[in-house]
Amino acid sequence: MKPPLNMSRSNKPLTQEANSSAHIDRAHQLAQDFNSKQDDTALTSLPHKNPDIFRFENNITAHSSRRGSLYRDSDATVVLPLSEHTPRLSMDDPYRQLLQQAEISQLRSKKKRHSSRVLRTSFISFVVLVSSLSGLDQGLISGNVMTLSFQKYFHYPLTSPLGNIVSIVNLGAFMASLFVYSGILEPCSRKKMLQISTMIYSLGAIVQVLALNQWCLLLGRFLLGVGMGFAFSMVIIYQFEFPLPCIRKRTLISIQCVSSVIAYSFGIWINCAFRYLGFAWRYPLSTHVALGIILNLMSFYLILESPSWLLKQKNDVEALVLISNVFDDGNFEENQTQLKFRVLKRDILLKSHLQKNSYPYAYILKDFSSIIKLLIGFQLLTRTNGVDAFLYYSPLILQQMGRGERKSIYLTGLNALIYSIVILAYVPLVLRKRKEKTNVLLGSIVMCALLFTISFTDWFPKSTTRYISILFAVFLFTHFISWDSIGWVMTIELLPHLSQAPVILLVSNFYWIFKWFVSLITPILIDRLSWKFYLIPSLSSFISIIFVLKIFPIETRDERLDSDDDSTGNGSGNHDDVFDDTGSEFSSSPSFSAYQINTLGSSIKQNNQAYSSIQNEQILPKNGNLSNQTHGSAQNVYFITSDSGPSRTGEFFSFHNRTDPNISDNIAANKPSSGGGQNSPGDMAVA
């Protein structure tokens, strides 16, 4: 006699056992019978579409191998019997209920799910496109403002109005970046902010293309800069809140810099292609409109919400579903998904503990002030070394050397082509770890010599101008391999993972304001100083040599203070590979009482001990007392412990001070034996 079948939504388990090989076929048959009985056209009917097979967990049999079928268009669920040999998990596991809710939430979702590869590729592509916006604008506007059609339409603007037209986009980006750094948008959805930024960018691009006078052009370029800076800042927050294990952060930064170079070359040749048409200055600028449409579509349909933001909003179920979709194609049982969720949850707790009720990024100003000053110095020297002057005003410089309007634009295009080809050939070396101090020092020396040579071009014959453009290409290449990405790479080299995003946000403000200042005064200085102008960036390069010799930190030469793998949950620690292996093994079920937190170290050494992968004995001695550093200040050691029980679903962790008597027994119980098991605190990476 056939056992009764439970077709209700209560999902009560059946008592009859069934072989695992027949589970799927039987589930399909039961689902088809249910569909035929309901006679509802809204339900998915077999065999036209197979229902999703999923792993179901009820309140009694956690992590069982029960399988069922669920229609996307209804809540009807078919539950199959449980085998008596199925391994069971303790009811006290706090991850179990969240896992069950996440699986059900994902299966009942009617949204189309993309594969993990598509989602990761879309995210990386979006980051690269946003990072190339500035380079594209440099290429488009540098040649555009010197075309005859632009000069006639805007009544031959002088050096000061020309500087305003070129530089105002950087001013808008600075104001948007400063607004993001203010912390006002911290509670806002990352995805919505990205969508708003791309819409502002598109609006600015349209106003710029349809400009009727200089004021409309300035307004359009200002809005373009606001959208650019807004998107750039939100991408920084997004990529550091949700780093992908398939690509290292250092590699992603290098790829962003390369994409900016390619976009610059693309913008230059767009100008060359349309310069003979009527209203030739409008067609190249319309490239911004096309790119804005692409970014809008990607932000709406391919970019997911930041799981860290979801965890901040206590939406742990949605965060787990999102992590599973990105990393394991929706498979919640993979260790990578579970460990990534736990690591992000730990980071959110750490950051909330550091921020408390104060300004969101206040703690970095107190604890990393010396590093921040160093990074700001890098940005100042990078922008004043002459790179922005050549990128924005290369056609203007060549015209002052005696070349005509047409030849100056084509020589700039040749310059950009050589620049891009050499950079692409150098990409494999850029992505590898290098001796940063030696590299930056040699680059400063070469740039100083090149700029000093270019300053004497007024005495050269006019026929040698083409060779001067080659010197520009050599200068730009030298700058790229030495100074272009160092200000950003140093951030991930010197700072712990939790502080990298806010520090980069702060440094990006100075990046935009320095860029605005240089692009504003360059045409004025070129007009008034002539050949003496090149002595200014030459002097800046000479100061860079002294800066590198005296101030450049030595920590990045041999080993990094923070691990990309630690931030993504990857314990492989293989830094020789550019791309990490997505299939690398992950430690299972880490003991959260093993994570120790040293709050707010006042020096690089203390922060290294607090945040890097070190042994617990370096922070907490065996006698249980708080250790004193060489600086004489006692460290506050905290523990992240697990709160079990169904009443705490979604909130598994809490902070406890080491001296709290309520957890003394728990800490002693979690102390590893002399044998040292797999999850012993001595083998775990601290936050």
From Swiss-Prot:
Membrane-side (Extracellular) residue stretches: 1-122, 186-192, 238-251, 305-410, 461-469, 522-533
Recorded GO CC terms: fungal-type vacuole membrane; membrane
Highest rank taxon of the organism: Eukaryota
Keywords: Membrane, Phosphoprotein, Transmembrane, Transmembrane helix, Transport
Cystines in this chain: none
Modified residues (Phosphoserine): 90
InterPro entries documented for this protein: MFS_dom, MFS_sugar_transport-like, MFS_Sugar_Transporters, MFS_trans_sf, Sugar/inositol_transpt, Sugar_transporter_CS
Residue numbers on the Cytoplasmic membrane side: 144-164, 214-216, 273-283, 432-439, 491-500, 555-687
Membrane topology recorded in Swiss-Prot or TrEMBL: Multi-pass membrane protein
GO molecular function: carbohydrate:proton symporter activity; transmembrane transporter activity
Region called Disordered, residue ranges: 1-22, 561-587, 654-687
Locations listed in the record: Membrane
Bilayer-crossing regions: 123-143, 165-185, 193-213, 217-237, 252-272, 284-304, 411-431, 440-460, 470-490, 501-521, 534-554
Primary localization class, coarse: membrane
Pfam family, one: Sugar_tr
Compositionally biased residues, Polar residues: 7-22, 660-673
Protein family (similarity comment): Belongs to the major facilitator superfamily. Sugar transporter (TC 2.A.1.1) family.
Protein name: Putative metabolite transport protein YDL199C
Species of the source: Saccharomyces cerevisiae (strain ATCC 204508 / S288c)
